[in-house]
């Protein structure tokens, strides 16, 4: 009987560990986000465009003079 209890506990623990580990799909999605953002800024995903002239993280693309094209920005790092 102890054998079956230990076996059950081991299977449950294995299931929990497997469930908690990130999947390959999650790793691929994370890598794609990094590839899309090739700048070295620490801008969040909500404001992904780093405009270096004013150092801000802009929600929309930067203008040709590297300034934010909208008023939706946060301080860059």
Swiss-Prot record:
InterPro entries: Conotoxin
Tissues where this protein is expressed: Expressed by the venom duct.
Record propeptide residues: 21-36
Main location: secreted
Signal peptide segment: 1-20
GO-annotated cellular components: extracellular region
Pfam families per the UniProt record, alphabetical: Conotoxin (PF02950)
Free-text comment about domains: The presence of a 'disulfide through disulfide knot' structurally defines this protein as a knottin. The cysteine framework is VI/VII (C-C-CC-C-C).
Identification of the protein by name: Conotoxin Cl6.12
The species this protein was found in: Californiconus californicus
Localisation: Secreted
Entry annotated with the keyword Cell inner membrane: no
Cystine pairings recorded for this chain: 43-58, 51-62, 57-68
Keywords: Disulfide bond, Knottin, Neurotoxin, Secreted, Signal, Toxin
Molecular function via GO: ion channel inhibitor activity; toxin activity
